[in-house]
């Protein structure tokens, strides 16, 4: 949201459905999905940065997969499609096919993890 607000400020003459309203991350993804060019640009920049970060993590840890959770994961393919493409751009060849998926526990993952720690394995 902070980056989108900055992009709006830097592009005062560019039309955007988010201009002049209070918005959340979900609104940025919805606007991008609906064809808003400035929102799509922000999603592309964000997924590029995240893809680069995941590629760096993959280079040092060789994970079986990346699971993206929280509210942002509900954005669906408007998030995951460009993220996967950017990731493949930055990842070493041996890591390029590492799956990037939405976490199935959503926002409750922390609660489940805490309970498991308390109860024990």
Regions found by a protein language model. Give the residues of each.
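ATP-binding/phosphotransfer module of carbohydrate and carboxylate kinases, centering on a glycine-rich
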Residues: 1-121
């Amino acid at each position: 949201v902070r980056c989108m607000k900055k992009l709006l400020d830097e592009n005062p003459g560019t039309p955007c459905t988010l201009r002049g309203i209070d918005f959340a991350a979900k609104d940025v993804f919805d606007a991008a999905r609906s064809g808003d060019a400035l929102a799509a640009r922000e999603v592309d920049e964000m997924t590029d940065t995240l893809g680069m970060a995941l590629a760096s993590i993959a280079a040092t840890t060789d994970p079986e997969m990346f699971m993206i959770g929280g509210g942002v994961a509900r954005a669906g393919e408007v998030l995951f499609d460009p993220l996967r493409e950017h990731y493949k751009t930055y990842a070493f060849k041996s890591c390029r096919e590492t799956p990037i998926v939405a976490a199935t526990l959503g926002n409750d993952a922390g609660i489940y993890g805490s309970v498991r720690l308390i109860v024990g394995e």
